[in-house]
Amino acid sequence: MVYSYTEKKRIRKDFGKRDQVLDTPYLLSIQLDSFKQFIEADPEGEYGLEAAFRSVFPITSYSGSAELQYVSYRLGEPVFDVKECQIRGVTYSAPLRVKLRMVLYDREAAAGTVKDIKEQEVYMGEIPLMTENGTFVINGTERVIVSQLHRSPGVFFDHDKGKTHSSGKVLYNARVIPYRGSWLDFEFDAKDNLFVRIDRRRKLPASIILRALDFSSEQILATFFETIGFEVKDGKLMMDLVPERLRGETATFDIVANGAVVVETGRRVTARHIRQLEKDSVTQIEVPVEYVVGKVAAKDYAHPQTGEMVVTANQALSLEAVANLSQAGFKHFEVLFTNELDHGAYMSETLRIDSSSSRLEALVEIYRMMRPGEPPTREAAEQLFENLFFSSERYDLSTVGRMKFNRRLAREDETGVGTLTKDDIVDVMKRLIDIRNGNDEVDDIDHLGNRRIRSVGEMAENQFRVGLVRVERAVKERLSLGDLDTLMPQDLINAKPISAAVKEFFGSSQLSQFMDQNNPLSEVTHKRRISALGPGGLTRERAGFEVRDVHPTHYGRLCPIETPEGPNIGLINSLSVYSRTNEYGFLETPYRKVIDGVITDEVDYLSAIEEGKYVIAQANAATTEDGRLKDELIPCRHKGESTFMNADQIQYMDVSPQQIVSVAAALIPFLEHDDANRALMGSNMQRQAVPTLRADKPLVGTGMERAVAVDSGVTVVAKRGGMIDYVDASRIVIKVNEDELLPGEAGIDIYSLTKYTRSNQNTCINQRPCVMLGEPVMAGDVLADGPSTDLGELALGQNLRVAFMPWNGYNFEDSILVNERVVQEDRLTTIHIQELACISRDTKLGPEEITADIPNVGEAALSKLDESGIVYVGAEVKGGDILVGKVTPKGETQLTPEEKLLRAIFGEKASDVKDSSLRVPNGVYGTVVDVQVFTRDGVEKDKRAKEIEEMQLKEAKKDLTEEFKILEDGIFGRSRNLLLAAGYSEDRLNKLDRSKWFELAIEDEAKQIELEQIAEQHVELKAEFDKKFENKRRKIIQGDDLAPGVLKIVKVYLAVKRRIQPGDKMAGRHGNKGVISKICPVEDMPHDEYGRPVDIVLNPLGVPSRMNIGQILEVHLGLAAKGIGEKIDRMVKEQRELHEMRDFLQQVYDLGEKDTQQVNVAELSDDDVRTLVGNLRKGLPVATPVFDGAKEREIKALLKLADLPESGQIALFDGRTGNAFERKVTVGYMYMLKLNHLVDDKMHARSTGSYSLVTQQPLGGKAQFGGQRFGEMEVWALEAYGAAYTLQEMLTVKSDDVNGRTKMYKNIVDGDHRMEPGMPESFNVLLKEIRSLGINIELDEE
């Protein structure tokens, strides 16, 4: 196997049994591809901005004399890059410029004669851009647009499960859902009449919509019913016979064929009878006249002479009506064919309750329903109906909707118009009646073939279109009004509504979320999240159990494990590892093709609908060496059911065992041994892990770690291969390989690293180089580790030595006992960075001022501020310290007339200011790591701001100069090589000034041209760098664009180092979470016979009832992995020969049943082996892929190889007494995470503080600096103890006795510890509430 440079440094032993057919796809592609489609020009105009423009333009004036046409658009360059936007708190966006053409037509001349054409580029607002990691920077914070799972447009058939009507009858309904426009519903009521609703308004008989489409009663009946013909022959009534229609009927008269009775009266007609009738080829049978009574006429029958209606269509026939028909000369007439079983008379019944009889009446009825209270006119009614479903401006099924619509109605063609047609409406009604008749099935709305994904690009496009439509109205009016000859397109377009719509979507939509930036995994998962909530989706309260449940079609598309616990369970899902969306927005998952029982390497992506047609085997189906399916019967899935089939019936096979789970679940080793509920908690808690100070790769992983770390974008990845030319803490320079160079390029790549920056969750983002000078790298290699990554692998926690045993009750109820050494070694120490901002505004009474001159503040409090009143970088501060001194002008105090007079004469303003400085919040401590000052344009900068500016300029200059030097060296290096090859000596070149080299001549003309090209490049490079520096300088010096009324903003960043302490929450990866109860001295911890203490002690009772056995297997395998590392460490210390090391490594990597990894240590160079051995001394990292992991036998073999007991249990000794524990204890290594639920953030205590306005009781919660509620049950407890005085104190002075508490405070200050309880304010509130009911209560003071 070929390993990249970074992978070679530490090769993970893989226990996977199956070869990977398909590499893990790029994890963020759902975001990036969707936005790319939105932003990139699309010549077809089907997607993105292009589609939005084409759908709104051209805009024609009301009179038709002018038209505004769309030509093209282009996006400009963003003003600031991503990092600058984050620092300045602005949106990372690019200006959108649209080329429009205004065409004026000559009114006098013939239609379509053009008078004037004007073209112009118009600015249409800013479009936020996506960063390369799939996020948006909005107002300085990183946000993610979560994809939405919504009901696909199309037609759906469903029933109410018998809940609507008291009889429990199942009522069927059909619903046509467009992408935009009015919903159209058809539904049956309990009497089997068919109704229609538009936009969920009141229902009308369904025939009304057909009448509005210009159907007559006859046409309606002809469309929905088959007919039976009757003929009067020789005084007998004959009926046309279709034998099949008689099946299941009971004969009410003898059915005679060719003189013989086939069915007697009262007998049921069976299949045998029908065969007999068909055999006799009977076309007509005689029926008694009574048989026709009650049948329904299929047509209008008018008297040939008088024109008078004899029978109208849909009229039930009586004997009299039949006689009338006969008299009028109608020897042959037709009635509707209906029966109870599968030809219901629904439309016929519906026509009876329909009051309208003409198209106009139907239109008026629809108008009244849509616009109650407005008087209908013919034009208005027609216009409304036309606009509802037949106007492309108001109604659009979209390509997806049309495809789903046509597929559901079993049409050949899947394309068509976006609006509805007559046929569409009729076909939907026909299909619904078919379902009611039992000839078709209803749809499953939770099937993933009926739910589609709406991603960023599509949602942004919709918002943009909304903005454009708002502009369209204004443009239409302006085109009709002003003097068009002098106007340009720019004067017609106002970009505000467009930018407002886009800004609103990115800033405050429910699906635009503050990115979860705890660690790389939480970022990746957030971007791959699929939500059913949001605009146009479900609401938590209304979502039932079915929508939330796992559906068979989730297989390989949505993860069945990862979803939040709580009210959102099942509504927020995560994409499976290999899942992707197709062109229509439906989720697809890959499968390997199987042909005649032979597995091929051909991979097809199938959507949920396509999958139903095939037989699909699982990835773990047994196979022979040559890739055939082994067993006779193979477990497989077909049409959503699990079943067994023969090998030759199998058509597809899963790509990988981890295909069904999401990224987070795929990171849990031995997931297959965990209960699903615990696996859910495990995948959710991994996202809350805080990056530790020193990342530590998991000893037991799953092989997914590298993919997550690289795809998340927190690491620095080489774009091209080459040699490391220079490396320090903040920059890596690569000299690019010759074969990867573009012609005429310096051949130097420079990567800048992010240092100690704050994340959205206040954790610390810091990148560290993991390459050395002179090392060769390939494209895609990891050059620097980010937060929670170690050598390019995800590292969320630490490998700790665990013992499963009780220890003096300190691990009761999932508590965790931790060794003090873990704290001393900073294993679980994390750095948190907090941002505190001080804003100076312009108030009515004058501007606020940032200054060190603060009234009534002692010297000590100002000791950490500089002369501008801003704290020094590096100062250590604690709660209550001043960070930024600020004073605010105070309001006028009540002045005496004399003072007023003096003020009026001398005009001096009140010199009163009050202290409004930024202080460190209570309970926060830390070190100031950075200060930033933003000053409004036109406001003078203070000394500190100028210092910061100078420093930034210096940094920028230094950076650019170094960068320039590196690139220049590259250029001179190439020209030197050319000149040396041309015969110039080293000495001569060294004596000359480098810039003179370009003046030397070379005989070979091609080389001379190349030298001239390089010289030209050098000049260009210098010019480019001067321009870059000027740009940088301008950006640093210019004032900042601050909100209105803000003069200055000072941001102070505090770094807090948090060690692990009792009360912090920790967890493993299997949902095994707990709180630290005690940090125990090293000497008291249980230790083994060599005196090595364990790091943490967990309760063994936490395992059996929770059924997450994966953690035990992880501990055993962790012990073996660590044991191998220790064995290698001993070999190094004994200075064994390199070939012995190679042999041992080969033995380790070859261990296992069928190992797909095949590491050949012989291929590695001696240096590679030394590096590898050095990295393995702390433990051999192993991978046990999900559902394809290490077997018990393999774990035992590895333990044996490491010279450890195969049971995984060892004898432990009590640290305090030195005695051995009674029985052996399971000891090993588990990967433990420290979660972002730290006791420091939760600890809180109040003495006095703010009170609620009405009840005067203290507020609750840490944010309000509130008190602890002494509730009803606590009162009972004190009552039970008879502690009357304590209780009185709780209910009065400590709560809402206003006078009492003030007095008490005063007494304490005076050193007098007495209290006098008074009347609690809540009692007064009660009195007032009773009085508001009209009952007067007064207290008699005796």
Swiss-Prot record:
CDD domains cross-referenced by the UniProt entry: RNA_pol_B_RPB2
Top-level lineage group: Bacteria
Reactions catalysed: RNA(n) + a ribonucleoside 5'-triphosphate = RNA(n+1) + diphosphate
InterPro entries per UniProt: DNA-dir_RNA_pol_bsu_ext_1_sf, DNA-dir_RNA_pol_bsu_external_1, DNA-dir_RNA_pol_su2, DNA-dir_RNAP_su2_dom, DNA-dir_RNAP_su2_hyb_sf, RNA_pol_bsu_bac, RNA_pol_bsu_CS, RNA_pol_bsu_protrusion
GO BP terms: DNA-templated transcription
Keyword entries, A-Z: DNA-directed RNA polymerase, Nucleotidyltransferase, Transcription, Transferase
Pfam family name, one: RNA_pol_Rpb2_6
Annotated Gene3D superfamilies: 2.40.50.100, 2.40.50.150, 3.90.1100.10, 6.10.140.1670, DNA-directed RNA polymerase, beta subunit, external 1 domain, DNA-directed RNA polymerase, subunit 2, domain 6, RNA polymerase alpha subunit dimerisation domain, RNA polymerase Rpb2, domain 2
Enzyme Commission number(s) from the entry: 2.7.7.6
GO cellular component: DNA-directed RNA polymerase complex
GO MF terms, alphabetically ordered: DNA binding; DNA-directed RNA polymerase activity; ribonucleoside binding
Functional summary from the UniProt entry: DNA-dependent RNA polymerase catalyzes the transcription of DNA into RNA using the four ribonucleoside triphosphates as substrates.
Subunit structure: The RNAP catalytic core consists of 2 alpha, 1 beta, 1 beta' and 1 omega subunit. When a sigma factor is associated with the core the holoenzyme is formed, which can initiate transcription.
Family: Belongs to the RNA polymerase beta chain family.
Listed name of the protein: DNA-directed RNA polymerase subunit beta
UniProt organism field: Aeromonas hydrophila subsp. hydrophila (strain ATCC 7966 / DSM 30187 / BCRC 13018 / CCUG 14551 / JCM 1027 / KCTC 2358 / NCIMB 9240 / NCTC 8049)
